[in-house]
Amino acid sequence: MRAATLTQIDRHGQQGNTENHTVQQLEVLFDECFAKQFNTQLVGGAAEPYYCAPHEGNPAEIHFSHDYFRSALHEIAHWCVAGDERRQRNDYGYWYAPDGRNAEQQREFEKVEVMPQAWELLFCAACGHPFRVSMDNLDNSPSDVSDFEKAVFEQAKTLLRTVPRGRGWQWVQMLALHYRRTAGFQREWIEQVFTAW
């Protein structure tokens, strides 16, 4: 099945297993990896990212912004972190503070974002795509992001040591197999893709 679906992508001008990172590739890979077992689809083109819980027989949908590759990886990371109960709620039942957060709100944001961004870093490393932490506060960017960068970087290394299972790891392996042609993960990939502010 995988070869057939990647062939379909190739007919539309998107080459699988190349340095080109397309959301169409991610959608196909996500479907192959998770659609059947978790009844979840990856959907691009949203003005804002959003998770729509399964309802009335419809699958759950992970909506990512526009056609942004990193947005797709980031939203998949949130999905991988969310437990069974959270995945039954729209946007996982979280309240989101928009741009313009004050310093205290930004610190709270960073606390809850370390884990998903650590997974996102591993996803980027697995497919050879540049990674930079997202402060997600364009109106009031903090002057120093180094503590947050360090926390994300260290959490990613911890995940490599302690969590070789679950949806996050399954996705890392799928990406590495597709983009790097190996099911293994090389720790140096993290340093290769990590970009400091």
PLM region spans:
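Auxiliary, metal-adjacent structural segments of Zn-dependent hydrolase domains
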Residues: 1-56, 106-111
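Short pre-active-site segment immediately N-terminal to the catalytic Zn-binding motif
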Residues: 55-71, 106
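Post-HEXXH active-site segment of zinc metalloproteases
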Residues: 59, 81-114, 133-142
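Active-site recognition of the HExxH zinc-binding catalytic motif
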Residues: 70-83
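An active-site-proximal "capping" alpha-helix that borders the catalytic cofactor pocket
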Residues: 110-126
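Short helix/loop segments within enzyme catalytic domains
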Residues: 122-137
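Pan-zinc metallopeptidase signature
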Residues: 135, 139-197
